[in-house]
Curated annotation (Swiss-Prot):
Belongs to the acyl carrier protein (ACP) family. One of its GO terms (cellular component) is cytoplasm. It is found in: Cytoplasm. Residues 1-75 form the Carrier domain. This is Acyl carrier protein. The modification O-(pantetheine 4'-phosphoryl)serine is found at residue 35. Gene3D superfamilies: ACP-like. Keywords: Cytoplasm, Fatty acid biosynthesis, Fatty acid metabolism, Lipid biosynthesis, Lipid metabolism, Phosphopantetheine, Phosphoprotein, Plasmid. Pathway: Lipid metabolism; fatty acid biosynthesis. Its main location: cytoplasm. GO terms for molecular function: acyl carrier activity. 4'-phosphopantetheine is transferred from CoA to a specific serine of apo-ACP by AcpS. This modification is essential for activity because fatty acids are bound in thioester linkage to the sulfhydryl of the prosthetic group. The gene is acpP. The keyword Lipid biosynthesis applies.
Amino acid sequence: MIKEKILSIVAFCYGIAYSKLSEETKFIEDLSADSLSLIEMLDMISFEFNLRIDESALEHIITIGDLISVVKNSTKSI
C-alpha cells in the first residue's frame, strides 16, 4: 500500500505513467528531477502519510526504492 501510494504521487509529480515507474527508477537520471521538484514531492508524501520527512533525507534518496524505505522507516517510528 505504501509503495503504490508513493508510485502514484511520483507519477503525478513528474507526469509519467505509473506503469513506467519501478523501485529502481532514479529521480535525477530517469525523471530529470531537481531539488525544488523533490521537495514538493516530499511535501505531498509527508501530507499523504501524515509524517515529517526532513529535507536532509534527500541526500540519501536516489531511487523510488530509497524513498519507499524512508517512508516505511518513518511510519514505523510513529
